[in-house]
Design a protein with these regions (language model features):
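ATP-binding glycine-rich phosphate-binding loop
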Residues: 13-40
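Active-site acidic catalytic loop and adjacent metal/ATP-binding pocket
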Residues: 34-39, 183-234
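ATP-binding pocket architecture of kinase catalytic cores
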Residues: 42-130
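ATP-dependent phospho-/nucleotidyl transfer catalytic cores
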Residues: 53, 129-201, 257, 307-311
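A glycine-centered beta->alpha junction motif in the catalytic cores
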Residues: 91-105, 149-155, 239, 283-302
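Active-site activation/catalytic loop segments of kinase-like enzymes and analogous catalytic loops
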Residues: 233-268, 282-307
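Central hydrophobic cores of alpha-helical transmembrane segments
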Residues: 275-282
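Helical subdomain adjoining the active site within ATP-dependent kinase catalytic cores
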Residues: 293-331
Length: 331
């Protein structure tokens, strides 16, 4: 006898003209959230996804709009009544194409290109419901930046013992404050206003798992569960941190490529390079590492911690020097 869950899923699929005798629910790709479905006759595969009601239907409607605009996302199907989802028991269910993966991860260059294209293509004339009640103001951005800089300052003061770690912490706190000063000088207010006028959307979770390299070599973006109206700078920062997490990576090379590629594709934000550069100056990776270790009550002075923080600090210092010159050249 079929379980309640199976009966519910088959009922959902029937709204897409897919019936129990014709389909197999092959496996659960993500526990109680994502299922792989196959048509027995055609062998076509689909992904059925469940989205919690508290996330609203925004991610689904965004996906549908991107598909309509021919952006590289999996095809999303409509029900027999031309809806993009079924609402059941506090959840939204929607059906999309299954993308056959190549088995390879997208390169960091492809990830940059993917984000830039998303920011350039996710600008729609009308708001996607639910419309946001507010949009980030310059004071909000500066306040968050100032708070993080203050945390680094506090950490530096707390371990001021005149040793190598003390020197590193002071250096990172100084860079954080310089980043804040540059951000204050930038055209941040105009950037925030423009993003609101353009109804800018952030992916919200742009990690390497949410950009697929398909078997046919196409790059496909997936999973808009955390997407929201906001500053594209948030996604840019997230990607910058992701590209620099490994201290072995060349910080300057990757930062240079990020700025060059992103703005060559998403040129509409070119007037605000100074905002992006000022934010990117902040030692984001170093900050995440030290704050994370502090929360877990890990000792920063241990040999392994000191070695990692030293390498991250070197990386952050090189990135800061490059961006300082970049900021001045942009002017």
């Amino acid at each position: 006898m079929a379980s309640k869950r199976s009966r519910l899923l088959f009922d959902i699929l029937s709204h897409y003209d897919l019936y129990g005798t014709e389909i197999d629910i092959m496996k659960e790709l993500k526990k109680e959230k994502v299922w792989l479905v196959q048509n027995k006759k055609t062998k076509e595969r689909y992904v059925l996804k469940r989205l919690s009601e508290d996330k609203t239907n925004f991610p689904i409607l965004l996906h549908s709009k991107l598909y309509q605009e021919r952006f590289h996302v999996p095809k999303i199907f409509q029900t027999k009544t031309d809806q993009y989802y079924i609402h059941r028991k506090g959840h939204y269910y929607y059906l999309m194409d299954y993308i056959v993966p190549s088995g390879m991860k997208p390169s960091f260059q492809q990830r940059i290109e993917g984000l830039a294209r998303f920011h350039a293509h996710s600008l729609f004339a009308d708001w996607i419901a639910p419309r946001p009640s507010s949009f980030l103001e310059p004071k909000d951005v500066l306040s968050a930046h100032r708070q993080k800089a203050a945390q680094l300052e506090e950490q530096a003061k707390a371990i001021d013992h005149g040793d190598a770690l003390s020197h590193i912490m002071k250096q990172m706190a100084w860079i954080a404050n310089q980043s804040y000063a540059w951000l204050e000088k930038s055209n941040l207010a105009d950037f925030c206003r423009t993003a609101k006028e353009r109804k800018a959307i952030c992916h919200g979770d742009y990690n390497s798992n949410n950009l697929l390299l398909a078997k046919n070599r196409e790059i496909m973006m997936i999973d808009f569960d955390r997407a929201y109206y906001g500053l594209p700078l948030d996604d840019f920062r997230f990607l910058l941190v992701s590209l620099m997490k490994n201290p072995k990576n060349d910080a300057v090379k990757r930062t240079r490529l990020l700025f060059a590629l992103y703005f060559s594709i998403c040129s509409l934000y070119t007037p605000y390079k100074s905002v992006y550069a000022a934010d990117a100056m902040f030692p984001h990776v170093f900050y995440s590492e030290t704050v994370g270790r502090e929360k877990q009550k890990q000792v920063l002075h241990s040999p392994s911690s000191l070695d990692l923080l030293t390498r991250l600090a070197e990386q952050e210092t090189k990135k800061f020097a490059f961006l300082s010159d970049f900021f001045k050249s942009e002017g």
